[in-house]
Swiss-Prot record:
Species annotation: Listeria welshimeri serovar 6b (strain ATCC 35897 / DSM 20650 / CCUG 15529 / CIP 8149 / NCTC 11857 / SLCC 5334 / V8)
Cellular component, GO annotation: plasma membrane
Localization of this protein: Cell membrane
Database matches in Pfam families: DUF445
Family recorded in the similarity comment: Belongs to the UPF0754 family.
InterPro entries (alphabetical): DUF445, UCP032178
Keyword Transmembrane helix: yes
Keywords, sorted A to Z: Cell membrane, Membrane, Transmembrane, Transmembrane helix
Bilayer topology: Multi-pass membrane protein
Protein name: UPF0754 membrane protein lwe2241
Transmembrane segment boundaries: 1-21, 357-377
Length: 377
């Protein structure tokens, strides 16, 4: 009986020592958090292994993460996965659909982004820029001829329109002369002519019936205007005037002292014509409503695909600039030792307990052997 008791006692003692040894060894990975001193000498094994090597551990984990986990190839492969593209597209489309149910004006949107009085500031900025650019244009182009400033396409278009202008002029003149107003105007001109020529005019008036003579002039005037020679003459005059206009320098038409006033006036006209109230106070959703289906089905998938492709193509530069190793190291360094211990225990708690139990089993086995050896030796 004493033999069995001795063996069991040795097994219990060995198991207890083995379990406690492993338990203490595990605890010494984290504890104590700080170095302990006795008689101004640091106590051995303090602080614990992880607190002592914390900085090195953080640095090596960062390097391992970048070298073996978040590699450029791994990131690129993940970004180019169809499932990821599909998930992001669905998420963006869902967010867009939710926003389309609201009514948000550009003014409100810019206000949310911290841009106060967006409409007023934008109009003020546009006004300043326009006036500055117009003044600049008038200054640097003042010695340029008009044919240099007018676009070639517009110049050709205007030249082709000159015959039409001639036709319109002759048509309007014919209608005017044939009208009662035209007849009255001719009659008044004849009467004025006679009055201005004194006795000769009075004598001529005795032999000429102003009414019938006015009608005759009216008829002949209409015929004269519609003759090809007259039309050619008018067209030639218009062409000559147009060429003279093109040959003039800008400063001849707009003197330097009037440039500022003209720039201000043009700017004012442009600002008044600019539909800023509609642009800034109409809900964005109203503007996009007609394009909602196209945005969801085409623009969002295309934008997501291009974005992921761009990030994947430049993943090496992005990873390098982000310095992921340093980022991981910094994040680990911000963890308190208590948090690190808790994290490790939560992840490996069961395995750590098994190590403790294994120490107890091995210790018990060694105790049995020691008990047997103690009895027989």
């Amino acid at each position: 009986m004493s033999v069995l008791f001795t063996i069991l006692l040795m097994a219990v003692i060995g198991g207890f020592i083995g379990a406690m040894t492993n338990y203490i060894a595990i605890r010494m990975l984290f504890r104590p958090y700080k170095a302990l001193y006795l008689f101004n000498k640091r106590v051995p094994f303090t602080p614990g292994l992880i607190p002592k090597r914390r900085d090195e551990l953080a640095e090596h984990i960062g390097k391992v993460v970048v070298s073996h986990l978040l590699t450029e190839d791994a990131i690129r492969a993940r970004l180019l996965e169809e499932n990821l593209q599909k998930e992001i597209t669905e998420t963006v489309a869902k967010m867009f659909h939710e926003k389309m149910q609201l009514e948000t004006t550009p003014n409100e949107l810019l206000h949310q982004l911290g841009y106060e009085n967006a409409e007023g500031r934008s109009i003020s900025w546009l006004e300043t820029v326009l006036e500055k650019e117009i003044n600049h244009f008038l200054t640097i182009k003042k010695t340029s001829q008009m044919n240099e400033l007018i676009p070639v396409m517009l110049e050709k278009e205007l030249e082709t329109k000159l015959p039409h202008v001639t036709e319109r002029i002759t048509s309007k003149l014919t209608l005017f002369i044939a009208s009662e107003e035209g007849k009255l105007q001719i009659k008044m001109m004849l009467q004025k002519f006679f009055e201005e020529h004194g006795k000769m005019g009075s004598m001529a008036r005795m032999f000429i019936n102003v009414e019938s003579f006015s009608e005759k002039i009216q008829q002949e005037g209409a015929k004269l205007i519609n003759q090809e020679d007259t039309k050619n003459l008018i067209n030639q005059l218009l062409t000559t005037e147009w060429k003279n206009f093109e040959a003039k320098e800008l400063q001849e038409l707009i003197p330097t002292e009037k440039q500022a006033h003209l720039a201000e006036q043009l700017t004012s006209e442009i600002i008044q014509a600019f539909p800023h109230d509609k642009i800034f106070n109409q809900p964005v959703q109203v503007i996009l409503r007609d394009y909602e289906v196209m945005i969801k089905s085409k623009i969002i998938p295309f934008a997501v695909e291009r974005m992921l492709d761009f990030v994947a193509t430049h993943s090496a530069d992005i990873v390098e600039r982000m310095d992921l190793a340093k980022l991981v190291e910094t994040q680990i360094a911000t963890f308190s030792l208590q948090e690190i211990e808790k994290l490790v225990v939560e992840i490996s708690g069961r395995e750590l307990k098994m190590i403790t139990y294994l120490g107890g089993i091995l210790g018990g086995f060694i105790g049995v052997i020691q008990g047997i050896l103690a009895i027989w030796i």
